[in-house]
Design a protein with these regions (language model features):
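Second-shell loop/turn segments in exported
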Residues: 63-67, 238-242, 262-270
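...with weaker cross-activation on analogous glycine-rich loops/strands in unrelated enzymes
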Residues: 290-354, 360
Length: 397
């Protein structure tokens, strides 16, 4: 009798444990599903948002681990779990990291900082940021810093590319008077006789204005170095902003100043550009910050054409090229150029050059016409993906 009772008790324990494990497994699946949904909502593009969250299932229950730069996403996840009655310890690291000790801002300190996909020099060149660009610093790994640029792009930079700043320092930098370099490429010198170079400079570089005379600006770099730039090559930032002529013709004029500049994967400076880095640079030099990559730019502005009816296009429109969607594969945008009229577009392919969609033209681009996808209009469009520097100044402020 005693053996029978013990057997029944053992069976009951097994059933209880089984049920408990079943409930736990069910909760873990729900938890994983909710994490995925939150990620899709707040961080659908890993190039611009970080949300790497995992679940540990230990003796004391569920534990959320990982990192993100999206506090609102974590708040949303905790609210959903509470609503569903799932208890989980939150050990997610919300960036910026504590070990930065308040140095969570930085300013690009060289003409064009190379930003990598991973924290090493051999990693892919993800993008570039030009001198004077204010960035957010999220964490440090070895000697490298994970930063986020004004267009929200996430990438790694070595310490030589930035000047770290705390809140007080970045506030002082932002509030100081600035100049913007408007020539395609040049140099800053230690004196007005232009003998000793301090640094090279690319178009769109922004520096602190220290003083000026009839012919030169005296400027300061983010790290405090001082130099001189000819007034023929730069403008006071506020003067430049107020003088911007954000029109199709100004976009075309700017685009042609980069003719022959070499193609560089990840390039967004006048030293070298990839296709989307080129269109991004053209728009920035006319006062507009647009998304970084072609596959992001294609979602900005308003649709114009998707059937190769080039008569609908206006100067300044962006044309996108790539692989069309099929029953088994998604569309893939891989290239972008800007329409300049007369059946022509300008783009960075091997170098910055002009191509035509006209079969009779000597510069007819059969390859790109054959993979044409659609055209978007960004000029004068109201879109949260487009930042107008005359209204919202993410570079300076």
């Amino acid at each position: 009798m005693k053996r029978i009772l013990l057997t029944k008790a053992f069976v009951l324990i097994l059933i209880t444990l089984n049920n408990s494990c079943g409930v736990r497994m069910g909760q873990k699946k729900v938890l994983a599903s909710e994490i995925e949904q939150i990620k899709n909502t707040f961080a659908p593009d890993k190039r611009t948002a970080l949300f790497n969250i995992d679940v540990l299932d230990g003796p004391s229950g569920f534990t959320l681990i990982g990192e993100t730069n999206l506090p609102r996403a974590i708040d949303s996840l905790e609210a959903v779990l509470s609503e569903k009655g799932i208890v989980a310890t939150n050990e997610v690291n919300v960036l910026p990291a504590d070990n930065l000790e308040g140095m969570t801002k930085a300013v690009i300190n060289i003409s064009a900082a190379n930003l990598r996909s991973n924290p090493k020099h051999s990693a892919e060149l993800a993008t570039q940021a030009t001198l004077g660009t204010v960035v957010n610093v999220l964490k440090k790994e070895g000697d490298w810093y994970l930063i986020q640029t004004p267009d929200k792009y996430l990438a790694w930079v070595d310490p030589g590319g930035i000047q770290l700043m705390n809140n007080a320092e970045i506030t002082a930098w932002k509030s100081s008077e600035k100049i913007i370099y408007t020539n395609t490429y040049g140099h800053a010198f230690s004196s007005i006789d232009a003998v000793n170079r301090i640094s090279d400079i690319v178009a769109g570089s922004i520096l602190k204005l220290v003083g000026s005379d009839e012919s030169h600006f005296k400027i300061a770099f983010p790290d405090g170095r001082q130099a001189y730039i000819s007034k023929d090559e730069a403008q006071e930032y506020e003067t430049w902003l107020s003088s911007l002529d954000y029109t199709a013709n100004s976009l075309i004029e700017t685009s042609k100043t980069l003719m022959g500049v070499p193609y560089l994967w990840g390039g967004t400076s006048t030293k070298g550009v990839d296709c989307s880095g080129y269109t991004k640079t053209i728009y920035f030099l006319n006062g507009m910050v647009i998304p970084r990559d072609a596959s992001q730019q294609v979602h900005a502005g308003k649709p114009v054409d998707s059937i190769a009816d080039f008569s609908k296009l206006e100067k300044g429109d962006l044309l996108f090229f790539g692989r069309k969607a099929t029953d088994s594969t998604a569309e893939k945008v891989v290239h972008v150029g800007m329409w300049i009229g007369d059946k022509q577009f300008i783009h960075s392919s091997e170098m910055v050059r002009i191509s035509s969609v006209d079969e009779e033209s000597p510069n007819y681009d059969a390859f790109n016409v054959g993979r044409y996808l659609r055209t978007q209009r960004l000029l004068n469009e109201d879109d949260p993906l487009l930042q107008n520097l005359t209204i919202n100044q993410p570079i300076k402020d």
